[in-house]
Protein backbone atom coordinates (compact mmCIF):
# COMPACT_ATOMS: atom_id res chain seq x y z
CA UNK A 1 0.00 0.00 0.00
CA UNK A 2 2.84 2.34 0.75
CA UNK A 3 4.98 1.04 -2.13
CA UNK A 4 7.63 -0.37 0.20
CA UNK A 5 7.14 -3.45 -1.98
CA UNK A 6 6.24 -3.14 -5.66
CA UNK A 7 2.78 -4.59 -6.31
CA UNK A 8 2.26 -6.59 -9.50
CA UNK A 9 -1.40 -5.72 -9.95
CA UNK A 10 -4.36 -3.93 -8.42
CA UNK A 11 -5.01 -0.33 -7.51
CA UNK A 12 -4.61 1.93 -4.50
CA UNK A 13 -7.23 4.49 -3.57
CA UNK A 14 -7.28 6.86 -0.63
CA UNK A 15 -10.28 9.09 0.02
CA UNK A 16 -11.55 8.47 -3.49
CA UNK A 17 -8.26 9.41 -5.16
CA UNK A 18 -6.68 6.62 -7.17
CA UNK A 19 -2.90 6.44 -7.30
CA UNK A 20 -1.72 6.79 -10.89
CA UNK A 21 0.34 3.74 -11.84
CA UNK A 22 1.92 2.11 -14.85
CA UNK A 23 3.73 -1.18 -15.42
CA UNK A 24 7.51 -1.09 -15.30
CA UNK A 25 9.79 -3.25 -17.47
CA UNK A 26 9.46 -6.15 -14.98
CA UNK A 27 5.67 -6.06 -15.10
CA UNK A 28 5.32 -4.52 -11.63
CA UNK A 29 3.24 -1.46 -10.89
CA UNK A 30 5.01 1.79 -10.23
CA UNK A 31 3.65 5.20 -9.36
CA UNK A 32 3.75 7.56 -12.33
CA UNK A 33 3.43 10.72 -10.25
CA UNK A 34 6.02 10.92 -7.43
CA UNK A 35 4.29 13.94 -5.87
CA UNK A 36 0.98 12.07 -5.70
CA UNK A 37 2.71 9.07 -4.12
CA UNK A 38 4.46 11.31 -1.56
CA UNK A 39 1.14 12.97 -0.71
CA UNK A 40 -0.50 9.57 -0.18
CA UNK A 41 2.42 8.38 1.93
CA UNK A 42 1.89 11.30 4.32
CA UNK A 43 -1.64 9.97 4.86
CA UNK A 44 -0.55 6.36 5.53
CA UNK A 45 1.51 6.12 8.71
CA UNK A 46 3.17 2.90 9.75
CA UNK A 47 3.90 1.46 13.19
CA UNK A 48 6.36 -1.42 13.14
CA UNK A 49 7.16 -4.34 15.40
CA UNK A 50 10.47 -2.82 16.52
CA UNK A 51 9.34 0.78 17.24
CA UNK A 52 12.04 2.35 15.01
CA UNK A 53 12.56 5.29 17.36
CA UNK A 54 15.78 7.24 16.91
CA UNK A 55 17.92 6.40 19.93
CA UNK A 56 19.84 9.69 19.81
CA UNK A 57 16.65 11.76 20.03
CA UNK A 58 14.30 12.34 22.94
CA UNK A 59 10.69 11.19 22.84
CA UNK A 60 9.56 14.69 21.90
CA UNK A 61 12.19 15.00 19.16
CA UNK A 62 11.15 11.63 17.73
CA UNK A 63 7.53 12.75 17.49
CA UNK A 64 8.08 16.24 16.04
CA UNK A 65 10.55 15.23 13.32
CA UNK A 66 7.89 14.31 10.72
CA UNK A 67 5.47 17.17 11.35
CA UNK A 68 8.30 19.71 11.06
CA UNK A 69 10.24 18.29 8.12
CA UNK A 70 7.46 16.65 6.11
CA UNK A 71 4.37 18.70 6.94
CA UNK A 72 6.21 21.99 7.44
CA UNK A 73 4.78 22.77 10.87
CA UNK A 74 6.47 25.27 13.15
CA UNK A 75 8.34 23.69 16.06
CA UNK A 76 5.89 25.09 18.63
CA UNK A 77 2.95 23.68 16.68
CA UNK A 78 4.64 20.29 16.31
CA UNK A 79 5.46 20.17 20.03
CA UNK A 80 1.85 20.98 20.94
CA UNK A 81 0.67 18.22 18.63
CA UNK A 82 3.23 15.78 20.07
CA UNK A 83 2.05 16.44 23.63
CA UNK A 84 -1.56 15.97 22.57
CA UNK A 85 -0.79 12.53 21.12
CA UNK A 86 1.43 11.52 24.03
CA UNK A 87 -1.59 12.10 26.27
CA UNK A 88 -3.79 10.18 23.84
CA UNK A 89 -1.56 7.09 24.09
CA UNK A 90 -1.49 7.32 27.88
CA UNK A 91 1.97 8.77 28.37
CA UNK A 92 2.53 11.78 30.57
CA UNK A 93 4.53 14.71 29.30
CA UNK A 94 7.19 13.70 31.83
CA UNK A 95 8.51 11.17 29.28
CA UNK A 96 9.02 13.74 26.51
CA UNK A 97 12.61 14.54 27.54
CA UNK A 98 13.61 10.90 27.97
CA UNK A 99 15.51 8.87 25.43
CA UNK A 100 13.89 5.67 24.11
CA UNK A 101 16.37 3.41 25.94
CA UNK A 102 14.93 4.61 29.27
CA UNK A 103 11.40 3.48 28.35
CA UNK A 104 9.79 0.05 28.52
CA UNK A 105 8.95 -1.70 25.27
CA UNK A 106 5.28 -0.84 25.74
CA UNK A 107 6.11 2.82 26.29
CA UNK A 108 8.36 2.85 23.23
CA UNK A 109 5.60 1.36 21.09
CA UNK A 110 3.13 3.95 22.39
CA UNK A 111 5.64 6.68 21.48
CA UNK A 112 5.83 5.14 17.99
CA UNK A 113 2.02 5.30 17.79
CA UNK A 114 2.05 8.93 18.98
CA UNK A 115 4.69 9.70 16.35
CA UNK A 116 2.47 8.25 13.62
CA UNK A 117 -0.61 10.05 14.97
CA UNK A 118 1.26 13.37 15.01
CA UNK A 119 1.21 13.24 11.21
CA UNK A 120 -2.61 13.06 11.46
CA UNK A 121 -2.92 10.33 8.83
CA UNK A 122 -6.05 8.97 7.23
CA UNK A 123 -4.90 5.37 7.72
CA UNK A 124 -2.66 3.69 10.30
CA UNK A 125 -0.75 0.58 9.22
CA UNK A 126 0.38 -1.67 12.09
CA UNK A 127 2.90 -4.44 11.42
CA UNK A 128 3.04 -6.83 14.39
CA UNK A 129 2.82 -3.96 16.90
CA UNK A 130 2.88 -6.21 19.97
CA UNK A 131 5.08 -9.14 18.96
CA UNK A 132 8.33 -7.61 20.30
CA UNK A 133 6.77 -6.81 23.69
CA UNK A 134 6.88 -8.70 26.94
CA UNK A 135 3.48 -10.34 27.52
CA UNK A 136 2.65 -8.01 30.42
CA UNK A 137 3.10 -4.95 28.15
CA UNK A 138 0.91 -6.12 25.27
CA UNK A 139 -2.29 -4.94 26.95
CA UNK A 140 -1.26 -1.29 27.15
CA UNK A 141 -0.60 -1.14 23.39
CA UNK A 142 -3.80 -3.04 22.53
CA UNK A 143 -5.75 -0.62 24.74
CA UNK A 144 -4.40 2.33 22.72
CA UNK A 145 -5.26 0.59 19.45
CA UNK A 146 -8.78 -0.20 20.72
CA UNK A 147 -9.21 3.47 21.62
CA UNK A 148 -8.17 4.49 18.09
CA UNK A 149 -10.66 2.01 16.61
CA UNK A 150 -13.45 3.34 18.81
CA UNK A 151 -12.89 6.88 17.53
CA UNK A 152 -13.34 5.61 13.98
CA UNK A 153 -9.73 5.67 12.84
CA UNK A 154 -9.00 3.45 9.85
CA UNK A 155 -6.35 0.88 10.72
CA UNK A 156 -4.85 -2.07 8.92
CA UNK A 157 -3.28 -4.45 11.41
CA UNK A 158 -1.08 -7.50 10.84
CA UNK A 159 -0.82 -9.36 14.13
CA UNK A 160 -0.97 -12.69 15.92
CA UNK A 161 -3.12 -11.22 18.73
Language-model-derived ranges and their functions:
Residues 120:
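Conserved catalytic motifs of ABC-family nucleotide-binding domains
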Residues 135-137:
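Helix N-cap at the start of a conserved alpha-helix in ABC-type nucleotide-binding domains
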Residues 99-103, 107:
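Conserved ABC ATPase signature
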Residues 124-127:
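Catalytic Walker B motif of ABC-type/P-loop ATPase nucleotide-binding domains
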